[in-house]
Amino acid sequence: MAAKIKKGDTVVVLTGRDAGRSGEVIQVMPKEDKAFVRGVNLVKKHQRQTQNQEGGIISKEAAIQLSNIAVADANGKPTRVGFRILDDGRKVRFAKTTGDQIDG
């Protein structure tokens, strides 16, 4: 199945603690059906001190389920993603709400 959410996409969180917030996808893990979104689903991590890093409590993004996020359209609203095949044979993603092309 083709990837509907890719690294670099702007997404909106649909459910959970951060519902309504948006951010850029940092990493997608398709086998686990999870993604990391910049500035969303932050957790506190207790970092041990090392030779080149100071110890303490740091904020870090945690993975979020792909079913709980949606790609944002040009208006910043969540949209479903469809696929089109262009005249030159390329397969591209498009926003179902506006019909705008997402990539390429």
From Swiss-Prot:
* CDD domains recorded: KOW_RPL26 (cd06089)
Q: How does it assemble?
A: Part of the 50S ribosomal subunit.
Instruction: Give a yes or no for keyword Aminoacyl-tRNA synthetase in this entry.
Output: no
HAMAP family given in the database record: Ribosomal_uL24_B (MF_01326_B)
**What family does the database annotate?**
Belongs to the universal ribosomal protein uL24 family.
The Gene Ontology biological process terms listed for this entry are:
translation
Q: What are the entry keywords?
A: Ribonucleoprotein, Ribosomal protein, RNA-binding, rRNA-binding
- Name this polypeptide is given: Large ribosomal subunit protein uL24
| Function field | One of two assembly initiator proteins, it binds directly to the 5'-end of the 23S rRNA, where it nucleates assembly of the 50S subunit. One of the proteins that surrounds the polypeptide exit tunnel on the outside of the subunit.
Q: Name one GO cellular component term.
A: ribonucleoprotein complex
Origin species, per record, is Methylorubrum extorquens (strain PA1)
Question: Could you cite one Gene Ontology molecular function of this protein?
Answer: rRNA binding
